[in-house]
């Protein structure tokens, strides 16, 4: 779908320049070069390349913890009496309220709901959300990353993707913050691979 949209730009009345998106660890060209000639695109192997490229979750040329994948260890059921803070929530300021009202008026028939709106809207708030996740959820995220509870819609998940998508945070600072937050012995035994998605 994206490629079709880009192809249509060739016929635009103005000259269009596509700029690289620095919100990702890999460029389109890097991914295409990796994917070329492969019968199946198993992302696990691409993630390994990204680890080698960045040095994240690596000890020299070997994966931290001695293996590439800890998925089997990350499938524990969450205890029923677990207490979870959840993601950091923010009260919308006057400007955000004004935008929410405008969206409701102009796009009220679109799918989804505007309320409750508790997301960060500034870089400072997004950094607070990252710090909150690192301090309160990351230590237990790995064990329970696939767990679900009726009482907790997010459990230990970060809910940082919106801030990546709109450029309030960048992927490198998030990965480095997570890697640096864990004690060295924890990093070796169960690094936060699932949180990194590689």
Question: Could you describe each region identified by the protein language model?
Answer:
Residues 2-118:
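Beta-rich, aromatic/charged-enriched effector core domains that present basic-aromatic interfaces
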Residues 73-198:
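Catalytic cores of enzymes that engage adenine nucleotides and/or redox cofactors via long glycine-rich
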């Amino acid at each position: 779908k994206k490629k079709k949209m880009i192809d249509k730009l060739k016929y635009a009345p103005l000259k269009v320049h596509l700029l690289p998106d620095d919100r990702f660890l890999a460029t389109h060209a890097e991914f295409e070069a990796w994917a070329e000639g492969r019968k199946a695109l198993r992302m696990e192997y691409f993630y390994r390349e990204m680890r080698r490229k960045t040095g994240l979750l690596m000890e020299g040329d070997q994966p931290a913890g001695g293996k590439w994948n800890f998925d089997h260890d990350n499938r524990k059921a969450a205890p029923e009496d677990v207490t979870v803070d959840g993601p950091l929530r923010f009260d919308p300021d006057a400007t955000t309220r004004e935008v929410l009202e405008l969206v409701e008026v102009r796009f009220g028939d679109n799918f989804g709901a505007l309320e409750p709106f508790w997301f960060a809207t500034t870089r400072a708030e997004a950094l607070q959300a990252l710090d909150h996740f690192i301090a309160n959820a990351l230590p237990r995220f790995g064990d329970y990353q696939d767990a679900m509870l009726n009482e907790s819609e997010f459990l230990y998940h970060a809910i940082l993707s919106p801030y990546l998508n709109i450029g309030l945070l960048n992927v490198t600072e998030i990965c480095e913050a997570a890697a640096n937050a864990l004690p060295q012995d924890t990093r070796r035994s169960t690094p936060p691979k699932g949180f990194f998605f590689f």
